[in-house]
């Protein structure tokens, strides 16, 4: 990136490394209740909401997401579901600003405890049907949510807005309509962790592919990783799957618009799957 910056400077064009690196990878994936898991990565130059709106055109339903405000500008037929892992993390960050001997009885510990209680209840409901989970959430989690909001509203008046705890409380209150939306349907999840796990391969190895020389290269990488991660999510061995694709792709006609669909993970033969233990 440094060499590119210097080369542009020699050509009389000022283009900083920060500008050149200002590219983002968007992730879209199916929920845990989907019969066929799909993981899609899309390269875009910015994080503007218009990219998500274009990608989700024609979609109607729930969208699990973090607290990014851009998602709240999406059409009304897309209902954003907030992430309790992010909310809990805010309280944990507030705790970490305190000496260890003060953390146990700190207000931030109370907020984190409320959030953790929700996750423990979700673990207990994991094997239930969506209909059963919906009922149990209203019965056991709704009271926890009501108590948490009451506590947060009370603490807001006694907490400096710019403090770490103040920011955690503000995030909770601002995101409340989205954080509680998971109560609407038993198929919805408490957090966005499923998507976080899908983006982890890029976070762990981003230095290895930091230098995508062109937008076209970044887009091509997005397609390849979409195929690989979707294959893994569906129990396929990535190596066996790619080997099958490369062996069969040359024999398909590119004039047939459906030729690529035949090579998707959903259509892979049994030989591509991981061996059962």
Q: Locations of the language-model features?
A:
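Catalytic center-proximal scaffold of phosphoryl-transfer enzymes
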Residues: 1-277
């Amino acid at each position: 990136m440094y060499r590119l910056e210097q080369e542009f400077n020699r050509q009389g064009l000022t283009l900083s490394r920060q500008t050149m690196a200002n590219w983002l990878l968007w992730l879209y994936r199916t929920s845990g209740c989907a019969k066929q898991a799909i993981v899609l990565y899309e390269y875009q130059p910015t994080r503007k909401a218009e990219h998500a709106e274009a990608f989700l055109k024609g979609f109607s339903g729930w969208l699990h997401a973090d607290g990014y405000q851009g998602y709240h500008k999406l059409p009304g037929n897309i209902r954003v579901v907030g992430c309790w892992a992010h909310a809990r993390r805010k309280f944990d960050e507030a705790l970490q600003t305190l000496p260890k001997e003060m953390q146990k009885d700190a207000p931030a510990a109370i907020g984190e405890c409320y959030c953790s209680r929700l996750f423990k209840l979700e673990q207990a409901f994991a094997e239930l049907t969506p209909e059963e989970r919906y009922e149990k959430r209203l019965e056991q989690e709704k009271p926890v949510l009501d108590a948490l909001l009451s506590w947060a509203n009370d603490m807001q008046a006694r907490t400096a807005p710019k403090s770490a705890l103040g920011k955690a409380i503000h995030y909770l209150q601002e995101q409340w309509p989205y954080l509680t939306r998971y109560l609407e349907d038993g198929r919805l999840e408490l957090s966005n962790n499923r998507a976080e796990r899908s983006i982890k391969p890029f976070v762990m190895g981003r230095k290895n592919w930091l230098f995508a020389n062109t937008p076209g290269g970044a887009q091509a990488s997005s397609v390849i990783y979409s195929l690989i991660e979707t294959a893994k999510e569906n129990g396929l061995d990535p190596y066996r799957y790619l080997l099958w694709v490369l062996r069969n792709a040359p024999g398909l006609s590119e004039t047939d618009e459906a030729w690529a669909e035949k090579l998707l993970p959903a259509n892979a033969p049994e030989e591509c799957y991981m061996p059962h233990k």
